[in-house]
């Protein structure tokens, strides 16, 4: 149990208020697909998600600004709570999120299948004719969409997908 006010519970992450400038972000073991959160958990998933994210933040270093804070878990939580969420949580700065969902598709399913049926493509990428539902795609596809409520995602055109590069220098 975390003795901080919970401010948000997402599909796989929970946010707790640390102070006016910081949040505690905890990656859970919840499983979600197609906007559905399943009742079964994947033990250790939250730790792996956090380690993967931290790996990328370290790789990009200060070349790409991010939400990580200099505060450590033991700066904001008692030792017992730190042990319970070790390796699955980070203290982050309160910032405005970039509401883009990064979807990588290996199979023709879900919204990708619907778009393929209508257009023969997914996210402006033309696919071979005659593919069936759940067919393996010729290569993995990056198909970004807006991060929104359940069932309300909109595809994002590659021409509109840009980083605020002026902030990166």
What are these model-predicted stretches?
Residues 1-148:
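Active-site loop/lid in soluble adenylation, ligation, and acyl-transfer enzymes
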Residues 151:
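Feature captures the catalytic ectodomains and active-site-proximal regions of enzymes
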Residues 159-165:
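Conserved small/polar residues in nucleotide/adenosyl-binding loops
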Residues 155-157:
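Acidic, proline/serine/threonine- and glycine-rich low-complexity intrinsically disordered segments
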């Amino acid at each position: 149990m975390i003795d901080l006010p919970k401010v948000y519970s997402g599909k796989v992450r929970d946010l707790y208020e640390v102070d006016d400038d910081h949040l505690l972000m905890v990656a859970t073991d919840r499983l979600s697909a197609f906007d559905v959160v399943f009742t079964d958990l994947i033990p250790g998933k939250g730790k792996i998600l956090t380690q993967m994210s931290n790996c990328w933040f370290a790789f990009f270093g200060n070349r790409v600004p991010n939400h990580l804070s200099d505060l450590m878990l033991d700066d904001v939580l008692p030792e017992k709570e730190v042990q319970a969420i070790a390796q699955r949580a980070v203290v982050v700065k309160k910032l405005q999120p970039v509401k883009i969902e990064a979807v990588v598709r290996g199979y023709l399913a879900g919204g990708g299948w619907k778009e393929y049926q209508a257009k023969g493509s997914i996210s402006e990428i033309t696919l071979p004719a005659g593919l069936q539902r759940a067919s393996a795609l010729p290569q993995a596809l990056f198909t970004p969409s807006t991060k929104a409520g359940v069932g309300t995602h909109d595809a994002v055109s590659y021409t509109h997908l840009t980083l605020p590069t002026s902030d990166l220098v």
